[in-house]
Amino acid sequence: MKQERRFGDYKSEAEAWITLATGEYYPDILPDACRLYEPVLVEFERLLKASHSSTFLFTSIMETQNQWMRTQLCRVFKKYVSPQTPVEMLKRKTDAAKVCAQFGAAFRNVVEVQQKFDSRPMPDEALCAVLWEYKDRGKKGYDLTERLFDLLRSQHARLVVTGPERAGKDVLLGAVFKDYPKPDRPVDFVIYNGKTILAIGLARYDSDRGGAQEDDRTGQYREVSQEIIGYADSHGMPHVKVIYVNDGPGLLLGSMWNDYAYIEDQWPGRVKVVTLRMVPDRITAKWLRS
């Protein structure tokens, strides 16, 4: 009987098993980027001219009603005024006072901001190109989950696969398992046979990853595996599996492949790490139901 290949066994031919998302060429993006973001720069200029301080400018941005415009204005503010402020904090209206208290003293002076802004053309191609990079952030991950769901549903027509296929709220394990110790633990998909939970899954596309980010991802995976399997075993569900779907060229960087192989080998038969191309061969009905 042929022995099933483990994730680590694919390493010698790893390039053949990853899926590459298509990108966009520079400088071809510039006309579209300038068309999209020139209104943002015009609005930033208007708010800047009406501001007597950088703190007032930030407060004015936070009062912008349109969420998309507010987010883009925050990104421009970060570049010109406060590069040290986390953009996620800048985007939340409820954090406005906290941002001013924690980072306001380091905001660049509004007069200097005006001078720097006026020194750039309108539209500023360089800044528009930077903003364009944010536009599709997360899109590759959404594409991955959408294709994954299509694969799983075509391969396992009698099973139910739930979770956000593109943008949407993650599945929280507190809504999947009763009395789960970390109810706010987010996962990307759950596979059911009727009402029986067969597998919990996470899916990620790694365009470029290494160093601390690499350590963070694999550390999180070890923690999630231990947590889910520990809960399942203590609640009479030794059949529950954990699936990590990872794809993209980031898998080829550093020790990523070996680290994922190690995670799979720690829980043989219970945890599998796969790329999209491995799903048909490795995520079988026999394994899911075993």
Regions found by a protein language model. Give the residues of each.
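Glycine-rich, often proline-containing surface loops adjacent to acidic residues and nearby aromatics
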Residues: M122-W132, I197-Y205
